[in-house]
Amino acid sequence: MISMLRCTFFFLSVILITSYFVTPTMSIKCNCKRHVIKPHICRKICGKNG
């Protein structure tokens, strides 16, 4: 029972962390041509993805 809860919690936290990191990179990628809050990250992503 406890291991099941722990497994579920771990799974949820992984999804949360992934979405937390993926969402800003997606939005930065979309705003590459505009002035972005973090231009160095944007430049890095733009360099990778054209």
Swiss-Prot record:
It is found in: Secreted. The modification Asparagine amide is found at N49. It holds the Pfam family Bee_toxin. The keyword Zinc-finger does not apply. Disulfide bonds join C30-C42, C32-C46. Transmembrane segments: none annotated. Keywords: Amidation, Disulfide bond, Formylation, Ion channel impairing toxin, Mast cell degranulation, Neurotoxin, Potassium channel impairing toxin, Secreted, Signal, Toxin. Expressed by the venom gland. One of its GO terms (cellular component) is extracellular region. The keyword Disulfide bond applies. The modification N6-formyllysine is found at K29, K44, K48. GO terms for molecular function: potassium channel regulator activity; toxin activity. Residues 1-27 form the signal peptide. Potent anti-inflammatory agent. At low concentrations, mediates the degranulation of mast cells thus evoking an inflammatory response. Also acts as a neurotoxin capable of blocking a class of voltage-gated potassium channels. This is Mast cell degranulating peptide. It comes from Apis mellifera.
